[in-house]
């Protein structure tokens, strides 16, 4: 079974920053408030919420001045495949949801989930315990989520994760979203006809290819803007925008301010 490296995090981010994930996993918000954005949608988490997210890039901001404390539980594909196979008979009792899985799912932590998390944290503090105990606690947590009120949506997301064409598309798009290709070129390079490519894309991401590419580029530009000294015109070109004015319009629509204002806010908050 895959090794799982669970990490306790502390974030202080009053403005949106980009967080990239190469694998799927769970966040448990132990303290504070935090907002996640994906494809223009905002997901607000309060203390005691749990978040399941698929691999990808997200904009994140803490809602309080105090640090947000989170527990990150990665869920590698091999671990999830073993989990689904091991408990397949039991999970088959849960109804299926055939809609496109959402990139993010928020769970309220019930008393039984809270107890499961406490047990997991207790094991993490013991270096003398074998790693299999951690894996068993995570399996327990996944089963509780599967049998929660959002269990059908959660299982639908898990079942899609093992789909090889979908995994290949995710890898392909992360490697090529900055390419200045037409959509037909993306489809051809991926090895599909345009119609089939669009259908697969909708199944994986739930939005159109153009909308996803635009969102991914604006997040990349946002990261360059806040973490470097490149000029705004150079950032626009680097992120694949046809002009600085188009980039500024897109950025304002996405974040509610211009790139220049965002950079000034970053300077003011960090000193």
UniProtKB/Swiss-Prot annotation:
Key word Oxidoreductase present: no
DNA-binding stretch(es), residue numbering of this chain: 184-205, 232-255
Taxonomic superkingdom: Bacteria
InterPro entries found in the cross-reference section: AraC_XylS_family_regulators, ExsA-like_N, Homeodomain-like_sf, HTH-like, HTH_AraC, HTH_AraC-typ_CS, Tscrpt_reg_AraC-type_HTH
Residue span(s) of domain HTH araC/xylS-type: 167-265
Gene3D superfamilies per record: Homeodomain-like
Keywords, sorted A to Z: Activator, DNA-binding, Plasmid, Transcription, Transcription regulation, Virulence
Keyword Zinc listed: no
GO biological process terms on file: regulation of DNA-templated transcription
Classification via SMART domains: HTH_ARAC
GO MF, any single term: DNA-binding transcription factor activity
PANTHER family: ARAC SUBFAMILY (PTHR46796:SF6), HTH-TYPE TRANSCRIPTIONAL ACTIVATOR RHAS-RELATED (PTHR46796)
Function: Transcriptional activator of the thermally regulated virulent yopE gene. LcrF activity could be modulated by the interaction with an inducer molecule serving as a temperature messenger. The availability of the messenger would in turn be controlled by a temperature-responsive process serving as a cellular thermometer.
Protein name: Thermoregulatory protein LcrF
Gene: lcrF
């Amino acid at each position: 079974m895959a090794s799982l490296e669970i990490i306790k995090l502390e974030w202080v981010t009053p403005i949106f920053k980009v967080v990239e994930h190469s694998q799927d996993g769970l966040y448990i918000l132990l303290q504070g408030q935090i907002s996640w954005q994906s494809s223009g949608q905002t997901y607000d988490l309060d203390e005691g919420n749990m978040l399941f997210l698929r691999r990808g890039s997200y904009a994140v901001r803490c809602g309080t001045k105090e640090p947000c404390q989170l527990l990150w539980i990665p869920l590698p594909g091999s671990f999830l495949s073993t989990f689904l196979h091991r408990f397949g008979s039991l999970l088959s009792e849960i109804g299926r949801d055939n809609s496109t899985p959402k990139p993010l799912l928020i769970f309220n932590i019930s008393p039984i989930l809270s107890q499961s998390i406490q047990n997991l944290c207790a094991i993490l503090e013991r270096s003398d315990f074998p790693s299999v105990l951690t894996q068993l606690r995570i399996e327990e947590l996944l089963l509780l989520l599967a049998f929660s009120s959002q269990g059908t949506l959660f299982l639908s997301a898990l079942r899609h994760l093992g789909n090889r064409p979908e995994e290949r598309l995710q890898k392909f798009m992360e490697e090529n979203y900055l390419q200045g290709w037409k959509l037909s070129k993306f489809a051809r390079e991926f090895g599909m006809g345009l119609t089939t490519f669009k259908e697969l894309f909708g199944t994986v991401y739930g939005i159109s290819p153009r909308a996803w590419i635009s969102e991914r580029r604006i997040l990349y530009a946002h990261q360059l803007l806040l973490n470097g000294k490149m000029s705004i015109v150079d950032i626009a070109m680097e992120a694949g925008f046809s002009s600085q004015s188009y980039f500024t319009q897109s950025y304002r629509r996405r974040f509610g301010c211009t790139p220049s204002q965002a950079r000034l806010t970053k300077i003011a908050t960090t000193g």
